[in-house]
């Protein structure tokens, strides 16, 4: 039973009614002994003394839990006549865009892979990429043309020297009278030997001419992201290819044959760059040029 209990029991409560079983006890022959010092007290008087200990705890009103005031529901929240359909359904029905993005990225990656493999396969002779300011020249196989000049003819033999033998003179003396002493004998000195030496011809000096150098040049405008390949003829007459070169590009070689001009070709991978080419010698002579501003040029 909840709630506070009154300090005393109500006389009308059935629990407070005294129960007297004296008739039964007497009939059964069982008599309870009287309590010492208790007198004749009824059971109801004995339970009243311990009633204060059996009361339930009653909380004060300040601790009672009370609900807030009643607020009726707003009927406008349940009005579906003015409900507008959300645009999220349209977004869900629209086709997603990410498959297109993934497809385009896959195509670009495949094209880049094919281009990279083709570049690695088609350059067996090139070991490094060319830079914009790098010019290299292959050493000539034959530096100069050597000519052997004939030895000068030996000088003619000198004629033998001419010597004259003096003739002996005999002097006869007469002992009749001592004549005056004879004059001293005169001896003729031999003329000096004449030696005729032929003048040697002046030596012929041959000045070797330096080998002619040929410069290949590629000019124009390179588009961003484009790959330009250049093919030229080296000093030995073999075709060389350089990939992904910078513009302007130049290469100087010394061909073995002085009559060989060589050739140079340049091409754009994506055909968006404008290229020109020229071939000039070391003295500035233009052997060939092409200024078509096209994605592919050759000289």
From Swiss-Prot:
- In the UniProt record, the gene name given for this protein reads mmpS3
Q: Which Pfam families does the record associate with it?
A: Mycobact_memb (PF05423)
The subcellular location is: Cell membrane
- Transmembrane stretches in the record are 101-121
Where is it mostly found?
membrane
Look up and give the organism this protein is from: Mycobacterium tuberculosis (strain ATCC 25618 / H37Rv)
Q: Which family does it belong to?
A: Belongs to the MmpS family.
Recorded protein name is: Probable transport accessory protein MmpS3
Q: Which residues form the signal peptide?
A: none
Quick one: a GO cellular component term?
A: plasma membrane
**Low complexity compositional bias, start-end:** 164-176
Q: Could you tell me the membrane topology recorded for this protein? A: Single-pass membrane protein
Record-listed N-acetylserine modification sites: 2
Please provide the record's keywords in A-Z order. Acetylation, Cell membrane, Membrane, Transmembrane, Transmembrane helix
Q: Keyword Transmembrane helix: yes or no?
A: yes
Where does this protein have compositionally biased stretches of type Polar residues? Answer: 128-139
Residue spans with biased composition (Pro residues)? Answer: 150-163, 177-193
Q: Where is this region: Disordered?
A: 1-72, 128-213
């Amino acid at each position: 039973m909840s709630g506070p209990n009154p300090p005393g029991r109500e006389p009308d409560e059935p629990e407070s009614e005294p129960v007297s079983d004296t008739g039964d006890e007497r009939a059964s022959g069982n008599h309870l002994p009287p309590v010492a010092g208790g007198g004749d007290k009824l059971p109801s008087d004995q339970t009243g003394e311990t009633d204060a200990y059996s009361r339930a705890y009653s909380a004060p009103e300040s601790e009672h839990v009370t609900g807030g005031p009643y607020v009726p529901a707003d009927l406008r929240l349940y009005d579906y006549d003015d409900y507008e359909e959300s645009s999220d359904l349209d977004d869900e029905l629209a086709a997603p865009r990410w498959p297109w993005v993934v497809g385009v990225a896959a195509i670009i990656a495949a094209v880049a892979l094919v281009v990279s493999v083709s570049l690695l396969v088609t350059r067996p002779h090139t070991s490094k990429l060319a830079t914009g300011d790098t010019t290299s020249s292959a050493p000539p196989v034959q530096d100069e043309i050597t000519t052997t000049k004939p030895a000068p003819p030996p000088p003619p033999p000198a004629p033998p020297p001419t010597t004259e033998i003096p003739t002996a003179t005999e002097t006869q003396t007469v002992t009749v009278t001592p004549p005056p002493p004879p004059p001293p004998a005169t001896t003729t000195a031999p003329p000096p030997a004449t030696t005729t030496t032929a003048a040697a011809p002046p030596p012929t000096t041959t000045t070797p001419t330096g080998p002619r150098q040929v410069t290949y040049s590629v000019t124009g405008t390179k588009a961003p992201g484009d790959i330009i390949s250049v093919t030229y003829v080296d000093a030995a007459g073999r075709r060389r290819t350089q990939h992904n070169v910078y513009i302007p590009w130049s290469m100087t070689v010394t061909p073995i044959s002085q009559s060989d001009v060589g050739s140079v070709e340049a091409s754009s991978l994506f055909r968006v760059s404008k290229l020109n080419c020229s071939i000039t010698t070391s003295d500035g002579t233009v052997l060939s040029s092409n200024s078509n501003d096209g994605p592919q040029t050759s000289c």
